[in-house]
A protein has these predicted regions:
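Hydrophobic h-region of N-terminal signal peptides that target proteins for export
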Residues: 9-17
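Short active-site neighborhood of thiol/selenol oxidoreductases, capturing the structured segment around
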Residues: 43-56
Length: 154
């Protein structure tokens, strides 16, 4: 019985930890982007690609704000979202580079692309790398500016 309890709590801890990880470390990011581009072409909706990692507190803060903060309604209405794991800057780096995302400036980093896979906007100076200090309101203001800017570029 003691072994069962230990195994149960270990399994519970693993499941809880996985729930806190917004970036799928085993996902095929290129395939996810390709599939999202297909969906976006139907609705003519731009795509936000968020490059981040599960060890990054600012990445987790941004993810939380995008799911439940003031940004959530704005983003779900105007964008499709793909999250790309960059690990310890050793995963999907080529993909970030292909969208002009300078990971060295910090993560999370964002690229906004059209349904035709054309770059609309890229964070260039680590604009979201201090998401914890920005808080929900600062993240919302950033998304509001980027949304307006991306609509103007259409």
């Amino acid at each position: 019985m003691k072994i069962f309890n230990v195994l149960f709590f270990v399994l519970l801890a693993v499941v809880a930890r996985a729930a806190d990880n917004p970036y799928n470390e085993t996902a095929d990011a290129k395939l996810e982007i390709k599939q999202t581009l297909t969906q976006a072409a139907v609705t003519q909706t731009p795509i936000i690609i968020v490059f981040g990692a599960n060890w990054c507190g600012d990445c987790k803060m941004l993810d939380s704000a995008m799911k439940s903060g003031a940004s959530a309604t704005l983003l779900s209405r105007d964008f499709k979202i793909v999250k790309v794991n960059v690990g310890r800057f050793d995963t999907n780096v080529d993909l970030a580079r292909s969208y002009g995302v300078p990971l060295a400036k910090g993560i999370p980093a964002v690229a906004i692309i059209s349904p035709k896979n054309e770059i609309i906007y890229v964070t260039q100076d680590g604009e979201l790398a201090n998401a914890r200090q920005m808080g929900d309101n600062g993240i919302y203001e950033f998304h509001k500016r980027v949304t307006a800017w991306s609509k103007a570029k259409k």
